[in-house]
Amino acid sequence: GRPPLELGGVLYCDRETVDKIEKMKVCTCLNPLHTAMSIYGCMLGYNLISAEMADEDLRSFIQKIGYIEAMPVVVDPGVLNPYEFIGAVINRRLPNPFMPDAPQRIATDTSQKLAIRFGETIKAYEARGLDKSNLVLIPLVLAGYARYLKGIDDNGQPFEISPDPLLAELQAIVNPLEVKEGEQDFSCLKALYSRCLLYTSPSPRDA
């Protein structure tokens, strides 16, 4: 026999369901929101995710990424409701000041995370024939990553970029770009997103 862990809220399910739960979390309901907040949190001078959640613009940003852009292609595991899950993430987990998570920590190895956290949603839109022009904020996250790689915050001051195995390579790619300049040659972004996403459409420049 086994202990009645279900009385404490534990869910028993098969491996396929576990995989679906993981995809729901990693591709839609948690990890993409974390990455979006980490990129912009570093550039805006935040040191805590919970503090970012007090910024109505950032809160609205991740709500729209999750509910409007990613949720149409969410993997539904059946045993958990994706809408209830993301609601708990946005309203309880992320604003919790007793969970002292830092955008700088979450931004570690971002180059290794973009493909699964955002690229899968883009590919799912294409696979289902959905209108990719509805993707506005996910491309904005990717555009923000190019800006993040410059290591200059919103006040024009340098900040320390989190460790990443591709950091030197990616910084070399965006080196021709200047922060807060006008018209520039953005062709280097194709190489950046091809390297991080193994996927090149839609262009984050369109954000």
Regions of interest found by a model, annotated:
Residues 17-25:
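Conserved phosphate-binding loops in nucleotide/dinucleotide-binding enzymes
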Residues 141, 145-146, 156-158, 162, ...:
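Long mid-to-C-terminal assembly/interaction modules of large eukaryotic proteins
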Residues 199-206:
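Conserved small/polar residues in nucleotide/adenosyl-binding loops
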Residues 19, 36, 46:
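Solvent-exposed loop/linker segments at secondary-structure transitions
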Residues 1-16:
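Primary mode marks residue(s) on the alpha4-beta5-alpha5 output face of response regulator receiver
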Residues 26-41:
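Conserved phosphate/anionic-ligand binding catalytic regions in large, soluble enzymes, centered on
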Residues 40-162:
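C-terminal catalytic subdomain
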